[in-house]
Each structure stands twice: as structure tokens, then as C-alpha cells.
């Protein structure tokens, strides 16, 4: 046994650590009584030890989560914040014990009023003081917008900004040192919210990571609605079952896979892929298991075509080829897209009986003309954000089944044209990365593990993590030249089969060799 005098430092250190933990826990429990901010009603402040599987008893059932695993010790503060006389947001702020001096806001998805607890757990694990809100309503339906313009305004922009303002004040109250830098992390609707902050509140964040952004929002809603008139319902001549979409997908891959130089089942640049679906029209008398009818081939061709408005103006670019299998059960399932139907029912027409099967381009014109609270999020002059010193890193999966990656390219072009800046100048503050083999915000057939959330985590180093790459860009001035993605053998947390460095737009990946396509150094970013 060691002499007692050798054990004393260990005991002292252990006691000090325990005291710090006790002090943190006590600070958390007393924090609610110290919050006296206008329009803020604190529901509770509770200490959550790392390793807890946190029960989310009040989370709306449609949000799909009854619990959340939390890795770090955090102080969880839940509150309601009034945004008008008839609206409020539910806001949570999580303060980690391993605080790194960084503030972060998470975003939302779809039309939803769901706090993304998985993002809050993810970012507090990195030491960010993190806020998340319900976007001004509960659940995934658009019905709360019906005759409630204040709720709609929260959804369009106000929820995120309110959460940031309150969250920063609370962070300064909870930590004596306040915070040094402010960040944002979101995808889909969360991506749109990130760009809305860049456009409308250029001083809210030092660094914004915005994935698969749902900007050009009104036209995105219409684009999502326009697939049903193309496919028709199950049983119609124009409808393809998921199995038939797999047949179409395999033919598209056959025609386009090797454009990038590698036969790996991944299309590196879908803009170069213009499949000819007549090649698999069934011959007379042939089995239809591995070919399409003429009507079905036309459906595939029309699905891969942009949406134009009543006067021939481009509303929304085409769905990128390569996403067919992922999109089939959601966008091409023979039913009107639920989010689009809700938007037209409860926002555009204020008519709960509007039928999504009747959609046409006149409806698209009505939605775009309305554009409540500039929810389009399509402003292209980012000069104030640039002058503030802010950085925005956006990414988009090239197998995205819900929001076409072509739309992110279109916005990039709009910014370049509006600001009169070529890519090398935009790179100073705005970088866009196309992620081959990534579906909507994650998943897919390729190297989608870029660290934009728990479901894509493959390491915390900036080289393997898009959030920490943003931190490095903001705090050290080292901008990411590529975004490395991991191809998992069997989903997140499993063995990494290979990695690939995804290129900064407008560059694209080309296989040069030598070696196998699984070697990230066998690829080159070219313009």
C-alpha cells in the first residue's frame, strides 16, 4: 500500500473535482431564480449528468423522440418566450460543464415545431452552450399556421433570432466569462434558418454551418407538390413502384457512374448526368420486372426536369439524378407531399379542404406572390454578413431526396452575380461543398459522414468534422479546402470503409488514380 502522504494529493484532487461538480450542479439548480428577462417564463432548470438517457415527456409525439442520450454534464433550462401577444416559442438552453467559451444555436426541420434534442446533445458534447427552440408551435403539422400570422412569423425567422438573443444573455449570466464566438448548426429547414440569419441578422453568428438549405422556400413547396401530378396514384400508368424506381436508378447509374472516372455506384457531379430513359422501355411481350413502360419512362424524365412557372420562368431546378431510390417512398409514392399540402391549406389559401391532387402552376404563382415574411430566404446580397467578418459553410448531399442540390448551386450563382464576386473572392466568407453519396442531411450510398450531427459523426478533428472545421476557420483563420466524409460499413459508429474529400464548389471530384476509388488521394478536385 502506498504511503499516506502519496495518497493525499489524489484525495485532494478528487475532492476538488467533486466540489467543482457540486458547485456546477448547485449553480444549475439555483439558476432559474436568477433569470428575470422580459417575456421569459422559466419552466425549470435541472442538472443532467453525462451518460443520462434523458426522458422527453413533453416532446410532441409527432416529433418522434421520447428520450435523448446526453454525453456531457449539462444544466438544462426550459422556458417559454413570448414573441407577441398571441405567440410564444418553447426554448431550451443547455449549458455544459466542459464549456469552451462558444455559443451555438441549433435549427429545425420541415414545417416542424420540434426542438432537435439530438443536435443539442451533439453540440454540448463539444462544449458549446447550446439553444434550441420549437419554432413557435408544437409538432410537425402546418396546421398551427392557420389564421395565426404571428406563429407563421416565428417559423419564418423570429424563433431562431429570439432564441439567439435570449440564449446569449443567459450564457453571459451562467458563465462569468460569457462567450467568445457564436455559431449556428442546422440542416434542411435548419439550413434555411441559417441563411435567414446570414441575410437578416448578420451579427448573430460568427460562423454558420447550413446544410441542404430549404431556401427558395415557396418554390420548394411547389416543386415538392408537383411530383404527384407527374406520377399519379398507385395503379396508374404513370406510377412507378419503389422496385421500378430501383430499375430506373440502376440504369441512371449505368449511364452516369463513370463520368467521374470511377465505377463506384456514386455520381460525383449530377449536373453532367442527363440519362436517356428510353433505353429501358420494355420490348413488346417482355417481362416488366427489369424495364419500364413508355409512360413510366416519361415519368422518370419529367421528374428529372425543372419546374417552370406560368410565364416560363424557372421556379426550381431539377431533382438531381441518383436520388431515385431514396426519393421513391417519399416524393414519388403516389400521394401529395404532406408538407406542401399543409402549406397550401393553412398558409396560401387558408382552406383546410384544399386538395393536393389538384396542384398546378397557378398554385405555385399564388404561393410565390404571397411569400409571407420573406420566407423565400432568397436574398443574394450578403455584404453586411461579409463586412461583419462572418463565415458561412454550406453543404448539400448529391443524393438528397427532399431538396435538390441544384438549388444550392443556383443560390451560389445568384450571390456571385449579385455581389459581383468570383469564387476566389466568395471563398473569403462563403464556401459551398457538394457531398456525393449523401442523402438529405445524412444517409446515402457514399461518404456522408462529415460530422454535421450525431448521425454523421466520424471524429472531432476539423479534418473529419464540418462543425469543428468552421470553428477552426473562425478562430484560427484556416478555411476548409475540402470536407472529408466517411463511408460507413453499416451506419454511423460502424467501421469506416473509406473516406473521400468532397470538393469546394465550383470544383468537382474526378478519379485520377493510381489505386482504388476507396483511396481519397486518388481523387482530384477540378474545375
Swiss-Prot record:
According to its UniProt record, which reaction does this protein catalyse? feruloyl-polysaccharide + H2O = ferulate + polysaccharide
Which cysteines share a disulfide bond?
28-75, 63-114, 187-441, 256-273, 282-291, 503-525
Q: What's its EC?
A: 3.1.1.73
Any one GO cellular component localisation term in the record: extracellular region
User: What are the glycosylated positions?
Assistant: 53, 85, 98, 138, 180, 311, 355, 516
Query: Which InterPro entries does this UniProt record tie to the protein?
Result: AB_hydrolase_fold (IPR029058), Tannase/feruloyl_esterase (IPR011118)
- Which top-level enzyme class is recorded in the Swiss-Prot or TrEMBL entry? hydrolase
Q: Where is the signal peptide, in residue numbers?
A: 1-19
GO biological process entries: xylan catabolic process
Q: What GO MF terms are annotated?
A: feruloyl esterase activity; metal ion binding
UniProtKB keywords: Calcium, Carbohydrate metabolism, Disulfide bond, Glycoprotein, Hydrolase, Metal-binding, Polysaccharide degradation, Secreted, Serine esterase, Signal, Xylan degradation
The annotated active site, in chain numbering, is 188, 400, 440
What this protein is reported to do is described as:
Involved in degradation of plant cell walls. Hydrolyzes the feruloyl-arabinose ester bond in arabinoxylans as well as the feruloyl-galactose and feruloyl-arabinose ester bonds in pectin.
The entry sums up its family as follows: Belongs to the tannase family.
Name the record gives this protein: Probable feruloyl esterase B-2
- Give the source species: Aspergillus terreus (strain NIH 2624 / FGSC A1156)
